[in-house]
């Protein structure tokens, strides 16, 4: 653990722990509830070999979330923060706040003690070929507002949180080209 005497932002403490972080690590936002297959997420990160892998998915509030634009290989090309100008039409793919990060990212030149993870470390990696997105239907929800917290509590009680974990069998319907249901 690292105890901050002064607030260091959501990534400043990482630089204080730089010598202790010797292998890829998970960085998880504290205002999210999730139930995901971490082994699958980490395996994907290792296969891609980037500095960072973002857990991405569509959400109910892309207007106040970081939009992620990627190529067909899921290499992140552009990161549009909520305050950035956005195109009129975009894919609802957002950073869910779960990350697998290589300690090599801490070689980034940072001149301030207070560090913003998204703006100072992640967003500048977009387009470098070193950051990938992991698209998943698993349950990850930001519960940082009262309405979102109420929705997450309801989803938890109804079993939606654990039910979407990819370790569990998922229901699916397959249609052939003429729209016929197949068993």
Q: How should these model regions be labeled?
A:
Residues 162-174:
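Long, charged amphipathic helices and adjacent flexible linkers at domain junctions
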Residues 72-73, 178:
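Residue-level recognition of short loop/turn positions
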Residues 24, 52, 130-131, 172:
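Residue-level preference for the first positions of well-ordered beta-strands
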Residues 21, 100-102, 181-182:
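Short, basic/glycine-rich phosphate-binding loops at helix/coil junctions
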Residues 25-26, 33, 39-46, 59-62, ...:
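Catalytic-core segments of class I nucleotidyltransferases/pyrophosphorylases
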Residues 65, 96, 169-171:
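Short loop/turn microsegments at loop-to-beta-strand junctions
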């Amino acid at each position: 653990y690292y105890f901050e005497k002064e607030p260091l932002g959501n990534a400043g403490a990482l630089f204080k722990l730089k010598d202790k972080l010797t292998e890829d690590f998970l960085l998880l936002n504290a205002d999210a509830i999730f139930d995901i297959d971490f082994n699958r997420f980490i395996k994907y990160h290792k296969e891609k070999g980037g500095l960072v892998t973002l857990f991405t998915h569509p959400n109910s509030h892309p207007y106040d979330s970081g939009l992620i634009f990627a190529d067909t290989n899921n290499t992140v090309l552009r990161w549009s923060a909520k305050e950035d100008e956005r195109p009129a039409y975009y894919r609802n793919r957002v950073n869910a706040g779960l990350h697998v990060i290589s300690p090599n990212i801490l070689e980034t030149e940072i001149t301030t003690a207070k560090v913003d993870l998204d703006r100072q470390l992640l967003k500048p990696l977009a387009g470098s070929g070193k950051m990938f997105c992991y698209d998943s239907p698993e349950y990850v929800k930001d519960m940082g507002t009262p309405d979102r917290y109420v929705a997450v509590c309801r989803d938890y009680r109804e079993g939606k949180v654990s039910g979407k974990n990819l370790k569990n069998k998922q229901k699916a319907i397959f249609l052939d080209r003429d729209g016929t249901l197949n068993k």
